[in-house]
Amino acid sequence: MKSVSKILNSNISQQLFYLLVLVLFLRIDLVFENNTPTGGDMGAHIVAIDTFIKDFMPNLQINGWSNDWFGGYPLYYFYFPLPAIITFIFNLVFPFGIAFKIMDEMSTILVVYSI
């Protein structure tokens, strides 16, 4: 049987390798450009998080009603609000475009550690 230290060392080195690969392939320099991220269904997420920051957080709400699509719908009643909360926290320091991209890339990197 392998000793615990060997298992931990191999696990840590494997995670560091995956993190290095992510850093090499992700364009970190583009994260800190203040523009709107696009691609896939990213626009839908931007609208929802922007509504969360501009309409809900000034009233200290986690969820509420949004008139952005479908003649109105309940926003964040049936959807996970943590990405919007994280973006709001980063938006206190960075512009919205940068805060959104930091949250997006942070979730990609943290997936490595959840495996």
Give residue spans per PLM region.
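Active-site lumenal/periplasmic loops and adjacent helix-entry segments of GT-C-fold
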Residues: 25-115
